Amino acid sequence: GITGICQIVKMTINYLKELGAKPFIVSAMGSHGGGTKEGQREVLTGYGITEEAMGVPIVTGTDTVDLGVNADGNHVWFDRAAYEADLIVPINRVKLHTDFIGELQSGLCKMLVIGLGNQKGCSAAHETDFCKFSNMLEESARLIIEKAPIGFGIAIMENAFDETCHLEAIPAQRMIAREKELVKLCVEKMPYIQVKKADIVIVEEIGKDVSGAGFDPNILGRSTVRTGYLLPIPEFQRMILLDVTDASHGNAIGVGLFDVITEKVFEKMDREITYANALACKCILDARIPMIAKNEEEAVRIAVKSCRNIDIHNLRIIRIKNTLKLEEIQVSEAIYKDEFL
């Protein structure tokens, strides 16, 4: 999730009220929440964004309007409730995307195209190959800014400690150009695992509140759609998953990138919600089921047994909370002696 998102949204609402506006919140999450009204409201509630807390109505829906065709020939769909408003203010974190590299990645433009596109717009956008995704976002965002009443956007940047380090209001006319500048700054703000080589990586949890892909491939280097990365990534053979966050509401997207999962992960996975997400972004391998272990101990035994050419008496194991929380990690004695002493 975005640090301080409730406070940022509330401050924006209060500012608009001071100007005489009567703001309301529109869920802008593409296929998240299963792509349903109820699911989207549940996700917002999980982040503390409720009508009572924000003091304004919240509109969740799937109805869209067709704004036209982008350069790839695909229709650009946009949330009807937002389109019929007098002014739209997108709020999002600008960061490196999990599936592609480009001048535009995750940010305000993606919020306009994917988030406010709802399930229909999200699926249409993902007709584009990821190698062309950044260009698609730019062309589609340009069309949306031209056709819809976008006023300004609130861009959020976070540092390696998951803390807000930059907050900026960007007029619609400068949104695309300014976001490109902010994306360049993201690389130096991103955390990474400072280990060169391991046998096994244990991840305690994945979830939509951690990353749109469940976990950030920029940190762990596993993806079904991308090959290049901008950050240093440890070399390892097996990856284990122990849990799915409660805030993910059963969405276990990303589970398919692991080699071994626990029964707890399998039991918490809501297949309908996970599959809806996987189909919307056309990454169905991200939802496949790996080998299932009873618990963490059995998962590690399976991982060790399936590794090749390792020293079983000096196992190199990394354990992290998730790809957002990297301030502290656990490493086995072999890694500690080799890389930190």
Predicted regions and their residues:
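Gly/Ser/Thr-rich loops at beta-strand to alpha-helix junctions
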Residues: 1-6, 29-35, 95-97, 207-209, ...
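N-terminal active-site beta-alpha-beta segment that forms phosphate/nucleotide-binding
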Residues: 1-40
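Short acidic, glycine/serine/threonine-rich loops at helix termini
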Residues: 7, 35-41, 69-72, 99-104, ...
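A glycine- and small-aliphatic-rich helix-loop capping segment at beta-alpha/alpha-beta transitions
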Residues: 8-16, 39-50, 105-114
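Short coil/turn connectors at secondary-structure junctions
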Residues: 19-22, 53-56, 72-73, 83-87, ...
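An acidic, phosphate/nucleotide-engaging active-site surface
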Residues: 39-103
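Conserved, well-structured core segments that form the ligand-binding/active-site neighborhood
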Residues: 77-202, 206-207
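C-terminal non-catalytic interaction/assembly regions of soluble proteins
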Residues: 216-341
